[in-house]
C-alpha cells in the first residue's frame, strides 16, 4: 500500500513537471516569434530589396531613422574583412512591448552584399574580429542566398554597432566574381514595428477613430487597453473601437471626435533606415604593378637627386680652376 502511494505521488510529480516544462517552452517559443522580426521579412519576401531599391523592412517600421555602414575602400580576393553597421539611438528611451509595458529597444540589420561575398567561416575570422562580434549569430536570408545576411533582434544597449565578418570571393575559383567596384546595401532598425506583414497594426503605433461621433463610453479592459464606443449622430449607429495595451488614450467620454482622429498618442520611439556603400575587389597583380611603378618613381627621383649632386660637384671643381 505504501509502495502504491509512493508510485502515485511520483506519477503526479512527473506529470506536473512535464506540464510546467511544456508551458515554459510554449512561452519561450511565442516570445521568440513575437520578437524575431527578421523572420517576418523572410516569410513574406523572396528578396529583402525591392526593384525600387527600398528594403522591405520599411513596410513594417514606418518611422525613418539613420543607419551607417563602414567597409574598406578595397579588398583582395579570399580575404576576411569587417563590415560595421551602426544603428544609433538614445539608450535612455523605452519602447512599448507586446504586453503594453515599457522596455529597452532591440536592434536588427540586413546586409545585402555583392554576389560571391559571404559570411566568413569561423575558422577564418581573426581573434580581434571575434572579440568585436561577441555573441552575435548571423544567418543567411535564404539558404541559397549567402550574400544576404540578417541579424536580430539583439539588445540595442549592447549591439547598436554590429560587426559582420565578410569573406571576399576569389575570381580565380569563382567565375561569377570579377575585379570590379560593387555596391553594398544595408538596412537597420531599432525598436518594434508598427505594422505586421498581414497588414494588421501592432500596439506600437497610433490608433484612429473609425467613425465621426460622440464618445459615449470608454471601458478599460482587464488585461489592458480600451474599448471605445462612438455614437454616430447621422444614422444613430454605435461604433466600437478597440485599443490594445500600450498607447496612451487622448480622448475622453463626452468628447466629439471625427473619423480618423487620433484616439491615442504614437508610442513608437524606434525606426528604420537604409544606406549603401561601395567596395572594390582589387586584383593583386594590379596592386603589385602599382607598387612596382611607385618603386620605380622613387628610384628615379633618388637617381635624379644623386645625379644633380654629382653635377654640382663637377661645376664646383671647374669653378675652382
From Swiss-Prot:
Gene: petA
Family: Belongs to the cytochrome f family.
A Pfam family this chain is assigned to: Apocytochr_F_N
SUPFAM superfamilies tied to this protein: Cytochrome f subunit of the cytochrome b6f complex, transmembrane anchor (SSF103431), Cytochrome f, large domain (SSF49441), Rudiment single hybrid motif (SSF51246)
Keyword Secreted: no
Signal peptide limits: 1-35
Gene Ontology process terms (BP): photosynthesis
Keyword Magnesium on entry: no
Protein name in the entry: Cytochrome f
Recorded topology in the membrane: Single-pass membrane protein
Transmembrane segments: 287-307
Binding-site residues for heme, renumbered to this chain: 37, 57, 60-61
Keywords noted in UniProt: Chloroplast, Electron transport, Heme, Iron, Membrane, Metal-binding, Photosynthesis, Plastid, Signal, Thylakoid, Transmembrane, Transmembrane helix, Transport
Complex formation: The 4 large subunits of the cytochrome b6-f complex are cytochrome b6, subunit IV (17 kDa polypeptide, petD), cytochrome f and the Rieske protein, while the 4 small subunits are PetG, PetL, PetM and PetN. The complex functions as a dimer.
Required cofactor(s): heme
Amino acid at each position: 500500500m505504501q509502495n502504491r502511494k509512493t508510485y502515485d505521488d511520483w506519477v503526479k510529480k512527473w506529470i506536473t513537471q512535464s506540464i510546467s516544462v511544456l508551458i515554459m517552452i510554449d512561452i519561450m517559443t511565442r516570445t521568440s516569434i513575437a520578437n524575431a522580426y527578421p523572420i517576418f521579412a523572410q516569410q513574406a519576401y523572396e528578396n529583402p530589396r525591392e526593384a525600387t531599391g527600398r528594403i522591405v523592412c520599411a513596410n513594417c517600421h514606418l518611422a525613418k531613422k539613420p543607419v551607417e555602414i563602414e567597409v574598406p575602400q578595397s579588398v583582395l580576393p579570399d580575404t576576411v574583412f569587417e563590415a560595421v553597421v551602426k544603428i544609433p539611438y538614445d539608450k535612455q528611451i523605452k519602447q512599448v512591448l507586446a504586453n503594453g509595458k515599457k522596455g529597452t529597444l532591440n536592434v536588427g540589420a540586413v546586409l545585402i552584399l555583392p554576389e560571391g561575398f559571404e559570411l566568413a567561416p569561423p575558422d577564418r575570422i581573426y581573434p580581434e574580429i571575434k572579440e568585436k562580434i561577441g555573441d552575435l549569430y548571423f544567418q543567411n536570408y535564404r539558404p541559397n542566398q549567402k550574400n544576404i545576411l540578417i541579424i536580430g533582434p539583439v539588445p540595442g544597449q549592447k549591439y547598436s554597432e554590429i560587426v559582420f565578418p565578410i569573406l571576399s570571393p576569389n575570381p580565380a575559383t569563382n567565375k561569377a566574381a570579377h575585379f570590379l567596384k560593387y555596391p553594398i546595401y544595408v538596412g537597420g532598425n531599432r525598436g518594434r514595428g508598427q505594422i505586421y506583414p498581414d497588414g494588421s497594426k501592432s500596439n506600437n503605433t497610433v490608433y484612429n477613430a473609425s467613425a465621426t461621433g460622440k464618445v459615449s463610453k470608454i471601458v478599460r479592459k482587464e488585461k489592458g487597453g480600451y474599448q471605445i464606443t462612438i455614437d454616430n449622430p447621422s444614422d444613430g449607429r454605435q461604433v466600437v473601437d478597440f485599443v490594445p495595451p500600450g498607447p496612451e488614450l487622448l480622448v475622453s467620454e463626452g468628447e466629439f471626435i471625427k473619423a480618423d482622429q487620433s484616439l491615442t498618442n504614437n508610442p513608437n520611439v524606434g525606426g528604420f533606415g537604409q544606406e549603401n556603400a561601395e567596395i572594390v575587389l582589387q586584383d593583386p597583380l594590379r596592386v603589385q604593378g602599382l607598387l612596382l611603378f611607385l618603386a620605380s618613381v622613387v628610384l628615379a627621383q633618388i637617381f635624379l637627386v644623386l645625379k644633380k649632386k654629382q653635377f654640382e660637384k663637377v661645376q664646383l671643381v671647374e669653378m675652382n680652376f
